[in-house]
């Protein structure tokens, strides 16, 4: 079989050598906005007579490379846009197969590192101390330290991080104590250990004025003090979710499961950094209604972090299985009808992505080809929701949830600590269901896996909780001007916040609505007063797409006060598409760009066709 190549990495592939361990020693400089230190990589040759190897780097300054106490020659290659620069290291001795060597690289990051966001004190809740956080997925670890920046290689790590002593450092690892910095009494060194091998996109660091509160036997929630109480309340279901996840996936091997609530510019809903999930503060709805994101990140402890996509072309393996587990966790907590409600909502999100890209766009394929494509640019709900839809369809085809969950647990056990491709997954599916090969052969695999657009088959969904959302949405969509008086606040009295959100999602699919309808909707439902981020996002999109000028400042405010890309990018796009707000949207972006997360700033710039 031909070797799978990771087209997103410039480093030597796993067939040549593998990084087994990283020992990171670094110092965080908030004045210069740099991380300076050494990365000691234990590398194992996978072939005989290995004389040199290549690592990924991006915007790094390399001071020197030392092997066995001796400086060795290295060469930084030409920058290849988003992939960074390959770093070739000459080895002092030729390695034989399985021989290990420790390569110590002294490096410094750039203030513009795409992996890091440096916040001024004014950008924090406490307004007193600066803040730093990393986001390495998919291919930004190379902008922190030289590495084989591919999910096909897994390594353990230890770290020692020096920070100003009034701040706290956390990593995607078990905390291993803190000591005064012997070289600077105004600083402290925090130590970490990660004994489970992980792909380097799961290396994570945060430094800030952080406090914690225990919310479960293996869970602390961390944030600035202003958010700690609210976060502890919002995420109180964490331990019960973990227990259900263990029942579905097998033992939780990571020891601790902490949560970190980041400042508003964090670009994602959550990031499954091991031992320390990162989440957006936009989940703080006050009623635990957005806790499915926690169920999702918990589920990654099995699908993604234990069983990992071998390359980003197979990202759906991480996300489709994780959404499938997430929805089972929520189903166990809130009922099977709720699982189906969320599943159908996900199909709607998939429809939106396919509509946005166009039904023949290659990014709407489940398995993508990222040759010369930045994974950040290809990112969408497709791997999540098309991936989930395939698994949900297979569940129904193969005999129901219990049967398919049996497969999922066996899949996790089979591929734990490994990195795999779609073919590995499919081969195991066929071997697990060897008595149902005829059923599996009914699946149009080429359409599901390799063709663009919506899947060839839509699974069956229980409509119980969705029907009320559709009914109310249809009333608004079909209403004539004379009918608007028939709407009143009691329309919503029996709807949960999840259903209210789905009502808006359904209505948004039919936007624009007549402006009079939107104004009446605000009059009777007072949506402007709702702070639930998912509801507010869809409401403001509906307003802007229906050309309500009064909503422009509200939409601009939401697009800039937080930076979760799920919200910020569509809001900016809608504002730019409305003639009355186009110039203001571009101007607002340009004013905020310097203080935005680097990836968010880049992608919004592309969306708005500026820069």
Curated annotation (Swiss-Prot):
Summary of subunit composition and partner proteins: Monomer.
GO CC aspect terms: cytosol; extracellular exosome; extracellular region; ficolin-1-rich granule lumen; nucleoplasm; nucleus; tertiary granule lumen
Lineage: Eukaryota, Metazoa, Chordata, Craniata, Vertebrata
Reported impact of residue 140 to Q: Aminopeptidase activity almost absent, but keeps LTA4 activity
Catalytic activity: leukotriene A4 + H2O = leukotriene B4; (5S,6S)-epoxy-(18R)-hydroxy-(7E,9E,11Z,14Z,16E)-eicosapentaenoate + H2O = resolvin E1; (5S,6S)-epoxy-(18S)-hydroxy-(7E,9E,11Z,14Z,16E)-eicosapentaenoate + H2O = 18S-resolvin E1; Release of the N-terminal residue from a tripeptide
Top-level enzyme category: hydrolase
Annotated effect of mutating residue 566 to R: No effect on epoxide hydrolase and aminopeptidase activity
UniProt entry tagged with the keyword Transmembrane: no
Effect of substituting residue 273 to A: No loss of epoxide hydrolase activity and aminopeptidase activity
Protein name as it appears in the record: Leukotriene A-4 hydrolase
PTM statement from Swiss-Prot or TrEMBL: Phosphorylation at Ser-416 inhibits leukotriene-A4 hydrolase activity.
Documented effect of changing residue 297 to A: Loss of epoxide hydrolase and aminopeptidase activities
Note describing how the cofactor binds: Binds 1 zinc ion per subunit.
Effect recorded for residue 135 to A: Strongly reduced aminopeptidase activity. Strongly decreased affinity for leukotriene. Abolishes epoxide hydrolase activity
Residues with site note (Essential for epoxide hydrolase activity, but not for aminopeptidase activity): 376
Pathway field: Lipid metabolism; leukotriene B4 biosynthesis
Effect upon mutating residue 137 to N: Aminopeptidase activity almost absent, but keeps LTA4 activity
Effect noted on mutating residue 372 to N: No loss of activity
Mutagenesis or variant effect for residue 270 to A: No loss of activity
Record annotation: effect of changing residue 272 to Q: Loss of LTA4 hydrolase activity, and aminopeptidase activity strongly impaired
Disulfide bonds: none
Gene: LTA4H
Phenotypic consequence of residue 269 to A: No loss of activity
PANTHER family xrefs: LEUKOTRIENE A-4 HYDROLASE
Reported tissue expression: Isoform 1 and isoform 2 are expressed in monocytes, lymphocytes, neutrophils, reticulocytes, platelets and fibroblasts.
Transmembrane feature ranges: none
């Amino acid at each position: 079989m031909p070797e799978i190549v990771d087209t997103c990495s410039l480093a030597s592939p796993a067939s040549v050598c593998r990084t087994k361990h990283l020992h990171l020693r670094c110092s965080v400089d908030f004045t210069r906005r740099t991380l300076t230190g050494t990365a000691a990589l234990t590398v194992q040759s996978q072939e005989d007579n290995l004389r040199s190897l290549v690592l990924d780097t991006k915007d790094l300054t390399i001071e020197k490379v030392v092997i066995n106490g001796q400086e060795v020659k290295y060469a930084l290659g030409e920058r290849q846009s988003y992939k960074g620069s390959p770093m070739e290291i000459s080895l002092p001795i030729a390695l034989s197969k399985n021989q290990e060597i420790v390569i110590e690289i002294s490096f410094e990051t750039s203030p513009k590192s795409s992996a890091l966001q440096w916040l001024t004190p004014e950008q924090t809740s406490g307004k007193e101390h600066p803040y730093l956080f990393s986001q390495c997925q998919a291919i930004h670890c190379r902008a922190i330290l030289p590495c084989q920046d591919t999910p096909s290689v897994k390594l353990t790590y230890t770290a020692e991080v020096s920070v100003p002593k009034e701040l706290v450092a956390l990593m995607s690892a078990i905390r291993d104590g803190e000591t005064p910095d012997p070289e600077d009494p105004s600083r402290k060194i925090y130590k970490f250990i990660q004994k489970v091998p992980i792909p380097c996109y799961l290396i994570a660091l945060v430094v800030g004025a952080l406090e914690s509160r225990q919310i479960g036997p293996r869970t602390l929630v961390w944030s600035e003090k202003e958010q700690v109480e609210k976060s502890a309340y919002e995420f109180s279901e964490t331990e019960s979710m973990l227990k259900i996840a263990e029942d579905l996936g097998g033992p939780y091997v990571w020891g601790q499961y902490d949560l970190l609530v980041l400042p508003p510019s964090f670009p994602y809903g959550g990031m499954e950094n091991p031992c320390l999930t990162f989440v957006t503060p936009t989940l703080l709805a006050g009623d635990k209604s957005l806790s499915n994101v926690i169920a999702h990140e918990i589920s990654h402890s099995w699908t993604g972090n234990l069983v990992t996509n071998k390359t980003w072309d197979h990202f759906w393996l991480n996300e489709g299985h994780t959404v499938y587990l997430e929805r089972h966790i929520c189903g166990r907590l809130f009922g099977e009808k709720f699982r189906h409600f969320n599943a159908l909502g996900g199909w709607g999100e998939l429809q939106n992505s396919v509509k946005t890209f166009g039904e023949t766009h290659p990014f709407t394929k489940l398995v993508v080809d990222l040759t010369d494509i930045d994974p950040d640019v290809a990112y969408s709900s497709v791997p999540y929701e098309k991936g989930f839809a395939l698994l949900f369809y297979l569940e129904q085809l193969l005999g129901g949830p219990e049967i398919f969950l049996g497969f999922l647990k066996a899949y996790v056990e089979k591929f734990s600590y490994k990195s795999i491709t779609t073919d590995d997954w499919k081969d195991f599916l066929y071997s697990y269901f060897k008595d149902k090969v005829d059923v599996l052969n009914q699946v149009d695999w080429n359409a599901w896996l390799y063709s663009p657009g919506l899947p060839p088959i839509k699974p069956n969904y229980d409509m119980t909780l969705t029907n009320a959302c559709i009914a109310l949405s249809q009333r608004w969509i079909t209403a004539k001007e004379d009918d608007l008086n028939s709407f009143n606040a009691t329309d919503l009295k029996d709807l949960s916040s999840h259903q209210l959100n789905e009502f808006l999602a359904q209505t948004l699919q039919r936007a624009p609505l007549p402006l009079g309808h939107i104004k009446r909707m605000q009059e009777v439902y007072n949506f402007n007063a709702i702070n639930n981020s998912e509801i507010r996002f869809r409401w403001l999109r509906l307003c802007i797409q229906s050309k309500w000028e009064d909503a422009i400042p509200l939409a601009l405010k939401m697009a800039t006060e937080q930076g979760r890309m799920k919200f910020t990018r569509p809001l900016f796009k809608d504002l730019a598409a409305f003639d009355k707000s186009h110039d203001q949207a571009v101007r607002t972006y340009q004013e905020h760009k310097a203080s935005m997360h680097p990836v968010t700033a880049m992608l919004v710039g592309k969306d708005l066709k500026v820069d």
